[in-house]
């Protein structure tokens, strides 16, 4: 933490008209990253998954097969309650095939037909594992639909039976039950906590062993991810404590799908507040997480960057745990990565380091990352520029004079000022805050900073912002103009007033108060 917390907070508040404090500076992923998060979930981590056809039949072939047999929902419903096990299995299988169609499976039609209680009843048939398997598959695909469709499965009292099937001696039945539970848990925190309350965690984790087939382990890991999802509310602390040792084992796995899901699970846990961050740290997984930032697979890097990024939204002490793992050595490559979204996440991470204490700010400087942040400020796409603006502005609050001076020497002001003309009010305010902090920190050298701002076109932009609709912005712009660009400096500085000679003429000293771009605050 800062050497004198009360002094540090006073300094922050004196610099920031908005009273931006450490909590504000350290930013969790918020609405500006919704698109990024959704893209990742769509690409890697679907909350719910439909089980496709086992056979290689096209949908049209399946439909034609049903039509040829004149199979109707009424017939399926009637035959699914038959006393003839062959007829019953065939009917449940027909329902499953309908639900496994890639194109618009008729989930609502089947729910309305009243088949759910029949399928749930089939889960009880320990004497007929094939029937249990087909019924579980059909219910899995119903639960892969909308929230209302998932709720229909839950309300049919299927969950206790799926949990019971986790102890089935037939592996395909176990695996199908795991898949079904994953879809139900993935519906949201209410379903997640309901399934947890019925005791899903221990039997689920018991499947993690060297002998488990890789496809089964992938499903188990995916369900663990869903257990870690959602932070409103986050999963129960006892559940997190149970899951973390399993994640510490799975992070060594050589299968990329399992590794990616494991790291995403950790990223969800670290997104749940400082208490959960501490639990992840205490598990000892961080030293194994950090090296994944340089993994050859981009999807592993992406997940790892999010996980460590969430950790550094915590306290200075929690942030230091990550820094102690030599995390900054991975950032030159991340900041120059061909994928823009990696650049953006990397700069977001660093913005939370520059929101830390002065030693942490110095670590970013010593790692040679400031010029790379400034490059992203100037050349990155807008989302990355926005994160870079936060990184710079945070440094102007947290940093010492010499650290802010270094920032200016790296020519931060021109690209910083360029962002004053964007439409995003938050970015404009962050930049104005940063510029004002630099001017305050410069003290007697403020006129040099003002000159740089004017030469790069920043003054003109600040003048325009005095007419901004946002009250905070126009007040801040006015204050900067009034204090540093008021035009009456000559009246205030006697050194600039020429001395009168005996002949009544004035003698100007050409060396008086000449400003240079080389300066020390």
Curated annotation (Swiss-Prot):
Changing residue 350 to P: In SPG88; loss of interaction with RCC1, DDX21, NCBP1 and NCBP2. Its main location: cytoplasm. It is found in: Cytoplasm; Nucleus. Changing residue 328 to M: In SPG88; decreased interaction with RCC1 and DDX21; no effect on interaction with NCBP1 and NCBP2. Ubiquitous. Highest levels in heart and skeletal muscle. A motif (Nuclear localization signal) lies at residues 43-52. It comes from the Eukaryota. Residues 18-29 have a biased composition (Basic and acidic residues). GO terms for cellular component: cytosol; host cell; NLS-dependent protein nuclear import complex; nuclear pore; nucleoplasm; nucleus. GO terms for molecular function: nuclear import signal receptor activity; nuclear localization sequence binding. Residues 137-229 are annotated as: NLS binding site (major). The keyword Transit peptide does not apply. Belongs to the importin alpha family. Forms a complex with importin subunit beta-1. Interacts with DDX21. Interacts with NCBP1, NCBP2/CBP20 and NCBP3. Interacts with RCC1. Interacts with ZC3H11A. (Microbial infection) Interacts with HIV-1 integrase; this interaction might play a role in nuclear import of HIV pre-integration complex. Consists of an N-terminal hydrophilic region, a hydrophobic central region composed of 10 repeats, and a short hydrophilic C-terminus. The N-terminal hydrophilic region contains the importin beta binding domain (IBB domain), which is sufficient for binding importin beta and essential for nuclear protein import. This is Importin subunit alpha-4.
């Amino acid at each position: 933490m800062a050497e004198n917390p009360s002094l540090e907070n006073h300094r922050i508040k004196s610099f920031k008209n908005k009273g931006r404090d450490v909590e504000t500076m350290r930013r969790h992923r918020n609405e500006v990253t919704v698109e990024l998060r959704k893209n990742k979930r769509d690409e890697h981590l679907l909350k719910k998954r439909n089980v496709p056809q086992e056979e290689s039949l096209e949908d049209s072939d399946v439909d034609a097969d049903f039509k040829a047999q004149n199979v109707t929902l009424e017939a399926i419903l009637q035959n699914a309650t038959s006393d003839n096990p062959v007829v019953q299995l065939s009917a449940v299988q027909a329902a499953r095939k309908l639900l496994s169609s890639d194109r618009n499976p008729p989930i609502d039609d089947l729910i309305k037909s009243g088949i759910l209680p029949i399928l749930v009843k089939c889960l009880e048939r320990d004497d007929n594992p094939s029937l249990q398997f087909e019924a579980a598959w059909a219910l899995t695909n119903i639960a892969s639909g909308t929230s209302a469709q998932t709720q229909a499965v839950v309300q049919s009292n299927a969950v206790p039976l799926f949990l019971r099937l986790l102890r089935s001696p037939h592996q395909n039945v176990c695996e199908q039950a795991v898949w079904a539970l994953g879809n139900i848990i993935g519906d949201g925190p209410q379903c997640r906590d309901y399934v947890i309350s019925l005791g899903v965690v221990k039997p689920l984790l018991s499947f993690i062993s060297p002998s488990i087939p890789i496809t089964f382990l992938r499903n188990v890991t995916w369900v663990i991810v869903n257990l870690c999802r959602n932070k409103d509310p986050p999963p129960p602390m006892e559940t997190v404590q149970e899951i973390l040792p399993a994640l510490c084992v799975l992070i060594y796995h050589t299968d990329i799908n399992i590794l990616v899901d494991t790291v995403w699970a950790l990223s969800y846990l670290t997104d749940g507040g400082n208490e959960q961050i501490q639990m992840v740290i205490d598990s000892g997984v961080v030293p194994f997480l950090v090296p994944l930032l340089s993994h050859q697979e981009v999807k592993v890097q992406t997940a790892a960057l999010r996980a460590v990024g969430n950790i550094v939204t915590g306290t200075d002490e929690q942030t230091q745990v990550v820094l102690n793992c030599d995390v900054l050595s991975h950032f030159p490559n991340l900041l120059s990565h061909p994928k823009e979204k990696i650049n953006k996440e990397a700069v977001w991470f660093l913005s939370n380091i520059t929101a830390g204490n002065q030693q942490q700010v110095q670590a970013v400087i010593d790692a040679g990352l400031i010029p790379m942040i400034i490059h992203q400020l100037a050349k990155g796409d807008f989302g990355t520029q926005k994160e870079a603006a936060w990184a710079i502005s945070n440094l102007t609050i947290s940093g010492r004079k010499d650290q802010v001076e270094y920032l200016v020497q790296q020519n931060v002001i021109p690209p910083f000022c360029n962002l004053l003309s964007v439409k995003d009010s938050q970015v404009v305010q962050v930049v104005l805050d940063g510029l004002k902090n630099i001017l305050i920190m410069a003290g007697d050298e403020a006129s040099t900073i003002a000159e740089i701002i004017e030469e790069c076109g920043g003054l003109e932009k600040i003048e325009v912002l005095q007419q901004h609709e946002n009250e905070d912005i126009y007040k801040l712009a006015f204050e900067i103009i009034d204090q540093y660009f008021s035009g009456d400096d000559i009246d205030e500085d006697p050194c600039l007033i020429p001395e009168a000679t005996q002949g009544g003429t004035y003698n100007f000293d050409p060396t008086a108060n000449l400003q240079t771009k080389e300066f020390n605050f």
